[in-house]
Amino acid sequence: MAYRLQTPDTGIALAERETTLIEEITIYITKNYFNNIKANDVGDAVGLHSDYANHIFKKAFGTTISDYIAELRIAHAISKLLTTDMSITDIAYECGFNSTARFNATFYKKKQCTPREYKRRLTKTQQISL
């Protein structure tokens, strides 16, 4: 009988623990996305196996840790493309990509164009609206 009474508490504690872990994961990613981190590094940083870290992260956000890191990097890269005169190579490395080839491939996958094309399109749009 005591086991049954403890089961719901265990379920709640697990949910609370998962919430805490997800917060730790997102904080770690936000503080380190510009480094060459991988999902394994994130799991290690919060004391979890990477598969479990990915599982609870996907349950919470509907995306994998790797995709979340890529989205965050691309968002920051777009900001830098539009607000600085940095080279694409410098932006790639500053946003955590280990090569311009990887940056271009990831950018293309997410935005269906290269970083250079993206900047050119937005520059044209801004000139037209002036």
Model-derived features with residue positions:
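Hydrophobic recognition helices of helix-based DNA-binding modules
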Residues: 1-6, 29, 57, 81
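C-terminal edge and immediately downstream basic/flexible tail or linker adjoining helix-turn-helix-like DNA-binding
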Residues: 124-130
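A short, Lys/Arg-enriched amphipathic alpha-helix from helix-turn-helix/homeodomain DNA-binding modules
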Residues: 10-37, 43-46, 68-86
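An amphipathic alpha-helical interaction segment
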Residues: 1-13, 17, 52
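Residue-level recognition of oxygen-bearing side chains
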Residues: 86-87, 102
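Basic/polar phosphate-binding segments, predominantly the helix-turn-helix DNA-binding elements
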Residues: 28, 36-72, 92-118
